[in-house]
Amino acid sequence: MRIILLGAPGAGKGTQAKIIEQKYNIAHISTGDMIRETIKSGSALGQELKKVLDAGELVSDEFIIKIVKDRISKNDCNNGFLLDGVPRTIPQAQELDKLGVNIDYIVEVDVADNLLIERITGRRIHPASGRTYHTKFNPPKVADKDDVTGEPLITRTDDNEDTVKQRLSVYHAQTAKLIDFYRNFSSTNTKIPKYIKINGDQAVEKVSQDIFDQLNKR
């Protein structure tokens, strides 16, 4: 099973991706995670990527396809995989097709923009462990302190409201074209994937069940 998981920043893609990964025993390929690891390394490329993300822009197609191509060649992708954060543009989708990457499902987790802004700007993170909190939906016991260590929580530099709005604008402009691309997609070497739209403004468990119900139909 090969799935592309779509969803605006804050839609809960990462959470659903982990659940799908465990249920179907497929590899979760998150370009966001790979990019953050590169930034954390402090390399020249990492510094360049940080500037791009801080400005609310998208990472180049060339870089994204390069890291995805390398990742899907690993043995844990033999049973299938879930692409989280790619493709985001038509050129990326076309490059995946050229690589012979056949997609079975396009799953979009849909959430209204005002809710996404609230979700993202309220996020707080413990850098060392990756534990995530939210000022409204999942607050720490002590404000801005990690529950386990008591260490300070941080806000990602790209989680401010202006940057989030810019990211959402870019997402909607590009994803609409991407969905049309896959809906009209035809190739002698590739079957047309099934497009599934899921209401993401529900409890995590309900979103997961809606996804499973659709995936199990085929």
Curated annotation (Swiss-Prot):
MF term (GO), any: adenylate kinase activity
EC number: 2.7.4.3
Reaction equations catalysed: AMP + ATP = 2 ADP
Pfam hit, one: ADK
Organism domain of life: Bacteria
One Gene Ontology biological process: AMP salvage
Protein name stated in the entry: Adenylate kinase
SUPFAM superfamilies cross-referenced by the UniProt entry: P-loop containing nucleoside triphosphate hydrolases (SSF52540)
Organism: Francisella tularensis subsp. tularensis (strain SCHU S4 / Schu 4)
